Amino acid sequence: MLLATDADHIHDEVDAALGGDHTVVRVHAGAEVLAAVDEHGPDLVVLVLQIGNMGGMATCLDLRLEERAERIPPQRVVMLLDREADVFLARRAEADAWVVKPVDPLALRRTAQDALAG
């Protein structure tokens, strides 16, 4: 599983919720996600909406463009949103699923399982 966040507490929360089922690889910026997808071939990509120089929405859109160009295999993407109003952004970015922070470990685990199931 690939996690893109620059916040240590988010990494800790996601690792606690999903780390038992997945190896969590972390990048600190959205611009690092594509290279990490190529290198690690994750089953799931978790993007925080607000990350460094390239936010979760732009990163998700970039992954979708790369998929359509057949440069990467299809990715399952879960976005961690700041508020309910951000659901619109997750839909526009074509995320497979999303969770509104603060992260509820059970909700995140369930959402990740649903996203992986397709």
What is the role of each PLM region?
Residues D43-L65:
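Conserved phosphotransfer microenvironments
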Residues H28-L44:
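Acidic, metal-coordinating helix/loop segments flanking the phosphotransfer/catalytic sites
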Residues A58, M79-A97:
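Alpha4 helix (beta4-alpha4-beta5 surface) of REC/receiver domains from two-component response regulators
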Residues V45, W98-V99:
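Two-component signal transduction core modules
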Residues D43, R68-R76:
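His-Asp phosphorelay/catalytic-motif detector in bacterial-type signaling
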Residues M1-D15:
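Conserved acidic segment of CheY-like receiver
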Residues A4-D6, V27, V45, L80:
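Conserved sequence signature across two-component system core domains
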Residues V103-A112:
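C-terminal output helix
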